[in-house]
A protein has these predicted regions:
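Active-site lid/adjacent beta-loop-alpha segment flanking the redox-cofactor pocket in flavoenzymes
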Residues: 1-79
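Short, glycine-/Ser/Thr-/acidic-enriched flexible segments
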Residues: 8-9, 76, 87-89, 182-183, ...
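Hydrophobic alpha-helical scaffolding
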Residues: 20, 24-31, 87-91, 154-158
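Generic secondary-structure signature for well-ordered alpha-helical cores
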Residues: 43-50, 58, 103-110, 122, ...
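Active-site nucleophile and cofactor-binding loops and adjacent substrate-binding regions
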Residues: 56-57, 84-90
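Ligand-binding pocket scaffold of soluble enzyme catalytic domains
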Residues: 80, 91-93
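Internal hydrophobic alpha-helix adjacent to the cofactor/substrate pocket in enzyme cavities
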Residues: 93-116
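Glycine/proline-enriched, intrinsically flexible loops and inter-domain linkers
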Residues: 112, 116-197
């Protein structure tokens, strides 16, 4: 029997600790991190306690800051195309992603609108190790969550603030983020409780 999971709070990898040639490798077993998930699995399938565990397979996944993969030409390096960050949907989307990426390489543009997965959707401020390390656990936790419209990430915020930010904040602005910019979504001067993001 196989038990798999996406933990509610992921552990970002420390890239400095990985060997340069690390590819398709596994990470050390981390039973302590798995324990809450294992407890839920045992609750759902009590027979697992008698069966026992043979091994814990712990491998890295690639999550982007918004949980959508990256396709397209790198804005930093002309002629360098990316098709990555697919986490667990790579098997399901690989064929179609490969096809449109090949079209893009050959004809200079994709045959359909790919903005939701276009690599250019991120600003440079969103592409720092600190920002990615902060956002990765939240992105993993939301991978199978209900995708409510307008949901805003709580981590890696205040990357880019306009000169008016403090005045807007004083006026009761409730902020959301687009391409790293904090911007008012609505104003709530009395600071009444609002629905969670």
């Amino acid at each position: 029997m196989l038990v798999g999971c996406f933990e509610p709070k992921g552990k970002p990898l420390d890239l400095e600790q990985l060997p340069e040639d690390f590819a398709f490798g596994l990470l050390p077993e981390d039973w302590e991190h798995l324990e809450p998930i294992l407890a839920n699995a045992l609750h759902r399938v009590p027979e697992l306690e008698q069966i026992g565990m043979k091994m814990l397979l712990n491998g890295p996944e690639s999550f982007t800051p918004d949980d959508r993969f990256l396709l397209g030409e790198s804005p930093e390096l002309r002629g360098f195309f990316l098709g990555c960050g697919m986490c667990s949907v790579g098997i399901a989307t690989g064929g179609g992603a490969g096809r449109v990426l090949a079209e893009w390489v050959l004809s200079g543009e994709p045959s359909m609108d790919l903005w939701p997965v276009d690599v250019r959707r991120f600003a440079l401020a969103q592409n720092t190790l600190r920002t990615l390390r902060e956002r990765a656990p939240e992105t993993l936790a939301l991978h199978y969550a209900v995708g409510f419209p307008g949901r805003q990430h709580q981590t890696a915020r205040n990357l880019r603030l306009s000169p008016l930010h403090s005045r807007l904040e004083a006026a009761g602005a409730e902020f959301g983020v687009r391409m790293g910019w904090e911007r008012p979504r609505w104003f709530n001067p009395e600071k009444r409780p609002t629905a969670p993001n």
